[in-house]
């Protein structure tokens, strides 16, 4: 397994028919100690993994939040909303089946966001993005992408899958920014700027 960075440049996805990206995090009490820290850790925090299908510069479909199969054909599927970060493994996952994507989809931007009011990256620890080759029905982790822990932002454009002719490439974006919480248009504007 490798850890992908922006400096690595785009990775060829030749032979990869199904790609999954997962996000996991651990809840934290933030800077609160004592009873407040215990209560915050117990409540957890809600980060969201969102995949935005692009047609050139325009967002055309969003997988995540309450939209689990926006194409309606299983080509871009979200696992569902984990609102606490508790449990083992990935808390949320998006899976792409490249051959079933409509031809007008030119790229997919994967974004993690503390999107709902009251959630923040500061209330999560050990945020990790995992990339899986899910070809053939079994998922094999092929890479990790780790965002900076120093951000005060609430959004991270993690990676972007780009159609190049008849194949796809995956490039690490790993850029953070501020997104107005609860505003899907702000989320999409953030994604298309990457």
Where are these regions (language model features)?
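Intrinsic-disorder/low-complexity signal
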Residues: 1-107, 111-194
